[in-house]
Amino acid sequence: VLVYNGSVCDAVWSASAGYNTQTGVYGTCASLDAWGTDVPYLQSVESPYEEQYHKLLRRVIGKDYTYIEYNDSRTGEPYQSADTTHKDLGGFVQYNTLVSNGRSYRYINQFVSSRYCFDFGTDAGGTPCMTYYGYGHGVGMSQCGAVGYAAEEGMNYKQILRHYYTGAQIRTRTTRSGGLFGWLAGLFR
């Protein structure tokens, strides 16, 4: 069981963090930016073994993408530019600004990863494209990073969990008398 200060951890994870888990703008805790909750064991850590998963290009065409339309709904004209410069220390986008005819639209991102960039007009038809780095919220353990740590550094599951969940401890259930209550009491020793 993974515990922090005697309490069982909410060991969240994502598929790929893209080189490091989310870096909090408001401090060192990644969970604060992702969900607005300060969880001390969910801090930003390196996750370097994600090279093959790091850059996932996904092209998004017009209204097929449910979270954003690339045309201004009031004028029907395409957005002229996108600004993703509002990022935290780890490169995760905090919010975006879309510009259409000089007007800006700021919205909270809801994409498959919060580390991405827009690239307008890169194909022959001028289809807007997005490049994602990582896949998921980027908080807690990265599955791709964990595989890399095991393969490249020979880390076992305990070392990997300690790396991704800062300050957490692994407690082993024992078969001593007292049943479940005895085991739970052991968590607080």
Language-model features, listed with the residues they occupy:
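Conserved, single-site charged/polar hotspot
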Residues: V1-R189
